[in-house]
Amino acid sequence: MSVLETFDPAVAEVIRHETERQEYNLELIASENFVSPAVLEAQGSVLTNKYAEGYPGKRYYGGCHCVDVVENLAIDRAKELFGADHVNVQPHSGSQANMAVYFSVLKPGDTVLGMNLAHGGHLTHGSPVNFSGKLFNIVPYGVSKETQTIDYEETERLALEHKPKMIVVGASAYPRIIDFEAFRRIADKVGAVVMVDMAHIAGLVAAGLHPSPVPYAEFVTTTTHKTLRGPRGGMIMCREEWAKTLNSNIFPGIQGGPLMHVIAAKAVAFKEALTPEFKKYQEQIVKNAKALAEGLTKRGFKLTSGGTDNHLMLVDLSQTELTGKVAEEALDRAGITVNKNGIPFDTRSPFITSGIRIGTPAATSHGLKEAEMEQVAGFIADVLGNVTDEAKLAAVKTQVNALMKRFPMYADRLA
């Protein structure tokens, strides 16, 4: 038995059950992924014990010579990966990364253009329930009703009318390529700073499968998990002239001591992302997303904007008797994990929704490819066509478990 199993069997049991869920169920939440054993090892290391307020070479505590090395490794690898002038790897999350950028540029009451959450944006891009919507004057832009893609003309009109100090670019549920150059042109017409939140697409950007925002934005934020397949955390890139201001807004501005075990895990993930194998992995994510989108469309499902260019898709259930909530719960009972999600111009509440969001990063980490995505489309169709038939859902779950056992990820942790 492990030390944890001996001392705290209750927690050990929960961890084992979650490992089984990740190993045998089909994870299709677009923002989730599975880290490598090397990343897990770094994150579970004794670096968790070390306080290191400040930055490498300028700490407020002694004994930081080891953690200085690991933080510099993370910074240097991120710079190489994305071609950034300056990198801060200390944000605990994507939300805190965004907050630090806002505080570097804005004052309370300043005007910000951000993508409407209901159209695929993120809470921290100006939602009224988030700090960003409470502190700043938010003008939301969104997608065209006809194409369900970003309406750049309307965004420019809003910018010219409201003269924002910052334009926030990026999304949490947008399946198409984002034209960063177009946002830069719009920002330049009104003298706005551009912040790109590429949390969802960072892995694709690193692999050259989505245009990079770095040449077009003063600031680029990201999480280090999702497509980047690192530990849960945040990171900020910026132009050199903003470096000092940005650093001071992370520490001491909004955070105290950085999580050095997480920063070590970030460094490991960035090294993985610099390999040819990582590029092949990202290519497979996109291939799988397109194959799954095609399989769902073939079975009569409607996708917002008609498909996907990246790692995710939104299934529009508004013309069916299903809600996103019902669909999510039925799929969960069949061993398939997705999340209910609003669709553009949704009339249902965020707790019910008219859609589900599906992504392929985690399934691709398991090793699934296009042929399996065709099977997955069939599983989803079988479930959503029989949401009240528990026997059918159980049968699909058996098929899902059999499929996933062919593609082990953490099997050694269950031995």
Swiss-Prot record:
Coiled coil: none annotated. Its main location: cytoplasm. PROSITE patterns: SHMT. It is found in: Cytoplasm. It catalyses: (6R)-5,10-methylene-5,6,7,8-tetrahydrofolate + glycine + H2O = (6S)-5,6,7,8-tetrahydrofolate + L-serine. Its EC number is 2.1.2.1. (6S)-5,6,7,8-tetrahydrofolate binds at L117, G121, H122, L123, S349, P350, F351. GO terms for cellular component: cytosol. Its cofactor is pyridoxal 5'-phosphate. The modification N6-(pyridoxal phosphate)lysine is found at K226. Keywords: Amino-acid biosynthesis, Cytoplasm, One-carbon metabolism, Pyridoxal phosphate, Transferase. Transmembrane segments: none annotated. It is an enzyme of class 2 (transferase). The record marks H225 as: Plays an important role in substrate specificity. It comes from the Bacteria. Disulfide bonds: none annotated. One of its GO terms (molecular function) is pyridoxal phosphate binding. Pathway: One-carbon metabolism; tetrahydrofolate interconversion; Amino-acid biosynthesis; glycine biosynthesis; glycine from L-serine: step 1/1. Belongs to the SHMT family. Catalyzes the reversible interconversion of serine and glycine with tetrahydrofolate (THF) serving as the one-carbon carrier. This reaction serves as the major source of one-carbon groups required for the biosynthesis of purines, thymidylate, methionine, and other important biomolecules. Also exhibits THF-independent aldolase activity toward beta-hydroxyamino acids, producing glycine and aldehydes, via a retro-aldol mechanism. NCBIfam families: PRK00011.1. Homodimer. HAMAP family: SHMT (MF_00051). This is Serine hydroxymethyltransferase. It comes from Geobacter sp. (strain M21). The lineage of its organism: Bacteria, Pseudomonadati, Thermodesulfobacteriota, Desulfuromonadia, Geobacterales.
